[in-house]
Amino acid sequence: EVERLAEKVKAEGIDGIFTGVHEFNLKRTRELCALCGMPFYATEEQLRLNFDKTFFKEQCVRAGIAVPESYTVSDPPLDAQLQAVRYPVIVKPRDGGGGVGVTICEDETELRQAIPGAVAGSPTGRFVVEEYVRGREITAVYTMKNGQISLSALRDRYPTKDHDRVTSQYDLSLMPSRYLPLFLAQSDPGFRRLLESVHAADGCVFFQGIAAPERIVFFECGYRLNALCDYHNIQDACGVSYLDMMIRYALTGSMGDADLSAEDPALPFFSGIFNM
C-alpha cells in the first residue's frame, strides 16, 4: 500500500525515508520516495543487481570479474541438460534472497529434488544452476559518494558447520581478509568498472564470492546495507560510517562531507563480527 504510505508521509511531515537489508523493502522504498519527491540512493538498474542473479553475472562477465560456471536446466530437466552438469552445483532462485530455496547438490538426484524449492523461492518461478566453488567465502564492501568509489572492507567468513545440502552458517566474519592482495589484483578493478557502468554515484554495495587458492569467483550482490552491520567495524577502524552517510542521503540527497580516502581495507589489526 505504497500510495497510503505516501499520504501518511505528507500528512506527518516526514523528512526522510530509509530502509535496510530486505529486497522487498528496497523496491517499496524506492517507489515511496518517487511518489513523495524524496531522494533514494539507487536506480532501478542498480537495484536489479540485487534481484536478478543472471543480470548480475552478466555484468560481472562484461567487467572482467570471475563468476561460477552456469548450466542451462529447465523444469523438468532434460536428459541432455543433466548430462552436461558437473557436480557439485548450487541451485537457487534467480530472483530470490535471504538464502531461501538455495541447495547444494552432489548428484543428479539431489539436483532434481532441489528444483521445486528454488522455483518456490522465486517471485517469478525461475531458478539457476551453477558451479559450486569450494573455498573461503569473502565479502567485499564498497561505499560510493558523488561518484567516488571506495573499497571499505574485505571480510573472510568462517563457518560453524555445514547443514545438509544447504549453505553454511557463520560464527565469525573477520577483516582484513587474507585474500586482500589477490582481490586487489583480480577483482577490484572489475568491480570499479561494473559500478561505473551502472552509474553508481552514492550509497553502499557488497559482493559475495568464494576465494580458492588462485582465483576468486563472485556469485551475489547486495546494493544495500548488509545484515552483518559492519559499518560499526569500518567506523571504528577508519572513522567513516556508511550508515550515517546513507541516513544523511535519505534526509538531504547528499552523502555529506565524510572523507572516503580515510578508508583502508588493509587494517593494521583484526576486526570481527560474531554471529551469536
Label every model-predicted segment.
Residues 3-13:
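Short, well-structured alpha-helical segments in soluble
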Residues 12-51, 64-71:
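A short, GP-enriched loop/loop-strand-helix hinge that lies immediately N-terminal to
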Residues 66-68, 88-90, 102-135, 155, ...:
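Conserved ATP-binding module of the ATP-grasp superfamily
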Residues 73, 102-107, 143-145:
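Short beta-strand-to-turn element immediately C-terminal to the catalytic PLP-Schiff-base lysine
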Residues 79-81, 247-276:
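Peripheral (often C-terminal) accessory segments that flank ATP-dependent C-N-forming ligase machineries
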Residues 89, 150, 217-220:
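Protein kinase-like catalytic core scaffold
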